Amino acid sequence: MAKDTRSRKKVARRSVSEGIAHIHASFNNTIVTITDRQGNALAWATSGGQGFRGSRKSTPFAAQVAAEVAGKAAQEYGVKNIDVLVKGPGPGRESAVRALGALGYKVNSISDVTPIPHNGCRAPKKRRV
């Protein structure tokens, strides 16, 4: 079987100075996505993807690790300033924002964009433990 010897073009890394960090914190997992101003994803990470499984996925430490991984990947694009959009009620909200600040990002604003229904779909029944 012959090997494919065609040369592949390297994709040039864009230089982006400002970005938006989308933090989706659910009760089961935390997803951190860093995008440019137009919404094109530069880097993303999840607490489940960092090796945390089961109930450890939903811890603040797992969200912190996911934010660090996504933040380091976005720094390769030259991102310095970020706006943070936090969505969801999960336990990883604050720790993910703190982790991004500790990486050296200048956090311009923090916004809560959790969707709140104006009496939409019926909520799931309450747990009886």
UniProtKB/Swiss-Prot annotation:
GO terms for molecular function: rRNA binding; structural constituent of ribosome. SUPFAM superfamilies: Translational machinery components. One of its GO terms (cellular component) is ribosome. The keyword RNA-binding applies. One of its GO terms (biological process) is translation. It comes from the Bacteria. Gene3D superfamilies: Ribosomal protein S11. InterPro entries: Ribosomal_uS11, Ribosomal_uS11_bac-type, Ribosomal_uS11_CS, Ribosomal_uS11_sf. Located on the platform of the 30S subunit, it bridges several disparate RNA helices of the 16S rRNA. Forms part of the Shine-Dalgarno cleft in the 70S ribosome. Part of the 30S ribosomal subunit. Interacts with proteins S7 and S18. Binds to IF-3. Belongs to the universal ribosomal protein uS11 family. This is Small ribosomal subunit protein uS11. It comes from Psychrobacter arcticus (strain DSM 17307 / VKM B-2377 / 273-4). The gene is rpsK.
